């Protein structure tokens, strides 16, 4: 059967406001039941088309509406993608993500995107793309080319969303996720903390994700990177313990999903990252850049993994979590484990 909509504001708030260590213990217990506690999946993200986006997302350096000093770049050639993917594979990356600053791709761009997917797949890497909104036709084309994952974040709660973005409706994002899922592509969808939202908004974001007909296989949790020139350049920092609580909550609510520590990680100290791993993070972006923002250095990450005795997952191990049979019934099989409170 499909995952039931068991999460509501009452039971989720009760869980969120548990004593910190009780919440962490519960998240770690669920994490260990579903994943190896000392292994982490590594992804990297390449911007294949940079800047001049018509959207007005108030946090984004790529919006054409804000003067951020970003140098725009047209859709790059496939040779650049292949070279970047080869370097990523050598560094231990198992998933190669490609992002384009579009509201939505045009049909004329699809053939080149298909070639990018096929070329990266030939290297033995998983593929992910984030291109904006997709219609059914485009989603099916990308699926047929072999795309494994599609990223389309909800960003925040439905109620707070209109204060962040006006050029795309919340329902448009849900529709794209449905199109991706219907096409047979696995879903990557999460949000951003630090937009000025409340605890209630953060909780509602996770409720929305967890109560989808099938929760995302991958859930990136971002901490706002304040970009000069955007309306959010002076937003307040997110408290580290508040951030970790959301990680733990995401792990409990979506026990079979990859929880990815994404943007903002370069500003976190080792102790905060370690607590995020303990709370349920089992995936990170690896490399010096996330689209247009800086990321934690590979050397720094390697040192942290060594201190924590954590190992990067190898490509040969990916079938354990990502074979098609398992993904097709991720939340429906008898081993599915969840705990509301």
UniProtKB/Swiss-Prot annotation:
Keywords on record: 2Fe-2S, 4Fe-4S, Biotin biosynthesis, Iron, Iron-sulfur, Metal-binding, S-adenosyl-L-methionine, Transferase
Keyword Metal-binding tagged: yes
Species of the source: Wigglesworthia glossinidia brevipalpis
UniProt catalytic activity: (4R,5S)-dethiobiotin + (sulfur carrier)-SH + 2 reduced [2Fe-2S]-[ferredoxin] + 2 S-adenosyl-L-methionine = (sulfur carrier)-H + biotin + 2 5'-deoxyadenosine + 2 L-methionine + 2 oxidized [2Fe-2S]-[ferredoxin]
UniProt-listed GO biological process terms: biotin biosynthetic process
Taxonomic lineage: Bacteria, Pseudomonadati, Pseudomonadota, Gammaproteobacteria, Enterobacterales
EC number: 2.8.1.6
Function, as annotated: Catalyzes the conversion of dethiobiotin (DTB) to biotin by the insertion of a sulfur atom into dethiobiotin via a radical-based mechanism.
Signal peptide: none
Quaternary organization: Homodimer.
Cofactor(s) recorded in Swiss-Prot or TrEMBL: [4Fe-4S] cluster; [2Fe-2S] cluster
Pathway linked to the protein: Cofactor biosynthesis; biotin biosynthesis; biotin from 7,8-diaminononanoate: step 2/2
Family: Belongs to the radical SAM superfamily. Biotin synthase family.
Designated name of the protein: Biotin synthase
């Amino acid at each position: 059967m499909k995952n039931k909509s068991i999460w509501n504001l009452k039971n989720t708030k009760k869980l969120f406001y548990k004593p910190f260590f009780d919440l962490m213990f519960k998240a770690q217990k669920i994490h260990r039941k579903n994943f190896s506690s000392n292994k982490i999946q590594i992804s990297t993200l390449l911007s294949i088309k940079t800047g001049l986006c018509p959207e007005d997302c108030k946090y984004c350096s790529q919006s054409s509406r804000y003067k951020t000093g970003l140098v725009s770049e047209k859709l790059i050639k496939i040779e650049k993608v292949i070279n970047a993917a080869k370097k990523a594979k050598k560094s231990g990356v198992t998933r190669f993500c490609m992002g384009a600053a579009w509201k939505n791709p045009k049909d004329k761009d699809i053939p080149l995107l298909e070639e990018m997917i096929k070329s990266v797949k030939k290297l033995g890497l998983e593929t992910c793309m984030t291109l904006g909104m997709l219609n059914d036709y485009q989603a099916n084309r990308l699926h047929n080319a072999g795309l494994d994952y599609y990223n389309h974040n909800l960003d925040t709660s439905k109620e707070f969303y209109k204060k962040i973005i006006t050029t795309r409706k919340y329902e448009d994002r849900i529709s794209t996720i449905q199109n991706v899922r219907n096409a047979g592509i696995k879903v990557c969808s999460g949000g951003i903390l630090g937009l000025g939202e409340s605890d209630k908004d953060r909780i509602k974001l996770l409720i929305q994700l967890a109560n989808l007909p099938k929760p995302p296989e991958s859930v990136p949790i971002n901490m706002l990177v304040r970009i000069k020139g955007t309306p959010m350049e002076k937003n307040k920092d997110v408290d580290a313990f508040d951030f970790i609580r959301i990680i733990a909550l995401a792990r409990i609510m979506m026990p079979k999903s990859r929880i990815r520590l994404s943007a903002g990680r370069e500003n976190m100290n080792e102790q905060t990252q370690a607590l995020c791993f303990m709370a349920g993070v089992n995936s990170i972006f690896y490399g010096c850049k996330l689209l247009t923002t800086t990321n934690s250095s590979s050397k720094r990450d390697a040192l942290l993994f060594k201190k924590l005795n954590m190992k990067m997952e190898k490509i040969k191990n990916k079938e354990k979590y990502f074979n098609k049979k398992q993904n097709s019934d991720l939340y429906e099989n008898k081993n599915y484990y969840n705990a509301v409170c």
